[in-house]
């Protein structure tokens, strides 16, 4: 069997990284001195790393992050915000995911909620968990359109699938009874099976009022399913008079900032 035949078969088996590495080995005279087991191990390592890198890229692309460049290591703890660094560091281990616990990120407009949520999402991708980012207004429209078209059950199935679901602009506007009912169905499907990151301008204590004015039993049902044992990150300003928007801190496009 010729070397080219071996390379062709590797390519047909979609082992392209291994094929490229094998070709390089064949062109390198010094490789003749390397034992077969070591050379073969090198080829396997290259193919393995390539596949993991491709998988990570695919997970990041499918997550549809609002801020795909967000990074935990780039979080600025000197930007005039009170941030619990110990808690943030703990959450980067992604243990909250295996515990099926949620994260609440609250703070004013421009405080960096979306950036932090996307950074947590990126860490989850690096641990090879599936992630999905969605704005609550878009989510509600999707669910209602599905309800109206008779495809609610089908559409509902796609939201429990991500291991981590990031819901941005959480309760920015008060929910109607119909919106709360649709949202309850989704949250119930995810309960104790996955983790959800909620980003809101309102503190948790104000969420009841944003769900049908706090008068519907759906408010209790939704809050009961998301608040128990959740991690809370409240991004507070140390000195509001000296505040910088996080879009300035991270150099983001103002049109993309939340």
Annotated model-derived regions:
Residues 70-94:
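N-terminal pre-Walker A segment at the start of P-loop NTPase domains
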């Amino acid at each position: 069997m010729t070397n080219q035949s071996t390379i062709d078969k590797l390519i047909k088996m979609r082992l392209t990284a291994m094929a490229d590495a094998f070709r390089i080995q064949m062109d390198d005279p010094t490789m003749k001195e390397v034992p077969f087991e070591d050379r073969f191990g090198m080829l396997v390592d290259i193919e393995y790393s390539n596949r993991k890198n491709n998988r990570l890229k695919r997970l990041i692309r499918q997550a549809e992050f609002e801020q795909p460049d967000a990074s935990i290591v780039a979080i600025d703890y000197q930007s005039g915000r009170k941030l619990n660094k110990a808690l943030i560091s703990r959450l980067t281990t992604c243990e909250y995911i295996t515990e099926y616990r949620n994260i609440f990120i609250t703070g004013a407009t421009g405080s960096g909620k979306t950036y932090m949520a996307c950074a947590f999402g990126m860490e989850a991708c690096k641990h090879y968990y599936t992630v999905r980012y969605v704005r609550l207004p878009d989510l509600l429209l999707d669910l209602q359109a599905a309800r109206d078209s008779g495809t609610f059950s089908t559409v509902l199935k796609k939201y429990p699938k991500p291991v981590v679901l990031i819901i941005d602009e959480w309760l920015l506007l008060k929910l109607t009874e119909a919106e709360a009912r649709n949202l309850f169905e989704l949250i119930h499907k995810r309960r104790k099976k996955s983790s959800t990151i909620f980003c809101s301008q309102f503190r948790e204590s104000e969420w009841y009022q944003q769900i049908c004015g706090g008068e519907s039993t759906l408010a209790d049902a939704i809050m009961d399913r998301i608040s128990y044992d959740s991690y809370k990150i409240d991004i507070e300003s140390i000195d509001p008079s000296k505040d910088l928007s996080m879009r300035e801190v991270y150099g983001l496009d103002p049109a993309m900032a939340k």
